[in-house]
A protein has these predicted regions:
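Primarily residues marking transmembrane-helix entry/exit sites
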Residues: 13-21, 111-115, 143-146
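Flexible cytoplasmic inter-helical loops of multi-pass small-molecule transporters
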Residues: 1-6
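Extracytoplasmic gate region of multi-pass secondary transporters
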Residues: 14-70, 124-133, 161-168
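Paired intracellular helix-loop junctions of major facilitator superfamily
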Residues: 80-81, 136-145
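Helix-to-loop junctions at the C-terminal end of transmembrane segments
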Residues: 68-84
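C-terminal transmembrane helical hairpin of 12-TM major facilitator-type secondary transporters
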Residues: 84-132
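Alpha-helical transmembrane segments of MFS and MFS-like solute carriers/permeases
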Residues: 9, 18-27, 60, 101, ...
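Loop-to-transmembrane helix entry/capping segments in MFS-fold secondary transporters
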Residues: 50-54, 142-152
Length: 169
């Protein structure tokens, strides 16, 4: 087993790891904030019940987000052969593309359009999840991969879960 000090020392020499962690943390901050605020917003703005929000909006959004994670990972892997940077820029493009869909979803007066904005936004946004693990483990030695993942998740979840819902809600 690798000592924590040795693992942290290696991580400190990997700027790509820290840039990716920063990006994943910002994405988690927004994602956790949106997901915790989304149901309350739908209930208040569109006068639906929490059950209706959960079944008719949040379930399809969750499904599209999961599919988007796999689709983005697949696309980035496919493009990686010719464009090694695709593992980073494909998910980054998805994050950027999600912004207008989320803005639209939270500003439209039409519930169907709001649902579509959230579904499409979730599909393109959550592709970063596949990339964060690929990059996080790809820039360190095999002996440090588990620690790298733990550090990434600790930082992203501490700030994402800890501050995202509070700030956005």
């Amino acid at each position: 087993p690798v000592e924590l000090r040795e693992a942290i020392r290696e991580l400190m020499t990997k700027p790509a790891f820290w840039w990716m962690t920063a990006g994943a943390t910002v994405a988690a901050f927004c994602g956790y904030g949106i997901s915790s605020f989304q149901s309350i917003f739908l209930v208040r703005a569109h006068e639906i019940t929490t059950g209706e929000a959960a079944i008719w909006i949040n379930a399809p959004v969750s499904m599209s987000s999961a599919i988007g994670t796999f689709a983005t990972g697949w696309l980035a892997t496919k493009l990686y052969k010719k464009h090694p940077g695709a593992i980073a820029w494909v998910p980054a493009l998805g994050l950027a593309l999600s912004i207008p869909f989320y803005v639209f979803a939270f500003t439209t007066q039409n519930l169907l359009y709001a649902a579509l904005g959230l579904i499409i936004g979730g599909f393109v946004k959550y592709g970063y999840i596949a990339a964060q693990y690929t990059i996080g483990q790809g820039v360190v030695s095999m002996r440090v991969r588990a620690t790298a993942t733990a550090v990434l998740l600790f930082i992203a979840n501490l700030i994402g879960y800890g501050c995202g819902p509070l700030f956005i809600g």
